[in-house]
Amino acid sequence: MTDALEQSVLALEGTVSVLKDSVESLKCANEPSTNLASTMLQTKRVFRLVPEYDVERSKLDLIEEVEPLVRTLGDKLRKSMGRMQRELDTLQQTYELNDLRLKKNISMDDDDALNSPDMGQEYEGRDADDVVMMASSTNEELEELKKLKEKKKQLENKLEILKQK
């Protein structure tokens, strides 16, 4: 048995000396060889089967890791959407208020300005004393306000027609 081990050691020492000589000759030659470089640096991919248990466990770990993040992002998104909706409502109310103020200022400056053709129809038929609730008006309340204003405008037009007759 010792003879076999000694022969193995001698064979390995011979292999090591051959490799050292090869490395030395490569250093001395120092000529770039793309073929040699491509064969020496080529990687080999090894695929092996992964047990189904490991795959399922990895999926569950990923779900446990990602699910709270998704929930957190969803909550932040809902809060942000609520904030944006409130801001939109406030901007709509501010628009209505500024629209009425502008109409009131225009009617004070020039009573004929509302009847001129170059003035938008947006201001026709409105009274200067229109009130806009700035408290906590909802979209439904604003829509109802617009409908009521339109109905008021129609009634005023009918009244004007009746007065002219």
UniProtKB/Swiss-Prot annotation:
Domain of life: Eukaryota
Biological processes per GO annotation: attachment of spindle microtubules to kinetochore; cell division; mitotic sister chromatid biorientation; positive regulation of attachment of spindle microtubules to kinetochore; positive regulation of microtubule polymerization; protein transport along microtubule to mitotic spindle pole body
Phosphoserine sites (modified residues): S107, S116
Keywords: Cell cycle, Cell division, Centromere, Chromosome, Chromosome partition, Coiled coil, Cytoplasm, Cytoskeleton, Kinetochore, Microtubule, Mitosis, Nucleus, Phosphoprotein
Coarse class of the protein's main subcellular location: nucleus
InterPro entries tied to this protein: DASH_Spc19 (IPR013251)
Signal found in the keyword field: no
GO (cellular component) term, any one: spindle microtubule
Location(s) in or outside the cell: Nucleus; Cytoplasm, Cytoskeleton, Spindle; Chromosome, Centromere, Kinetochore; Chromosome
Biological role: Component of the DASH complex that connects microtubules with kinetochores and couples microtubule depolymerisation to chromosome movement; it is involved in retrieving kinetochores to the spindle poles before their re-orientation on the spindle in early mitosis and allows microtubule depolymerization to pull chromosomes apart and resist detachment during anaphase.
Subunit structure: Component of the DASH complex consisting of ASK1, DAD1, DAD2, DAD3, DAD4, DAM1, DUO1, HSK3, SPC19 and SPC34, with a stoichiometry of one copy of each subunit per complex. Multiple DASH complexes oligomerize to form a ring that encircles spindle microtubules and organizes the rod-like NDC80 complexes of the outer kinetochore. DASH complex oligomerization strengthens microtubule attachments. On cytoplasmic microtubules, DASH complexes appear to form patches instead of rings.
Other noteworthy facts: Present with 639 molecules/cell in log phase SD medium.
Name this protein carries in UniProt: DASH complex subunit SPC19
Species name: Saccharomyces cerevisiae (strain ATCC 204508 / S288c) (Baker's yeast)
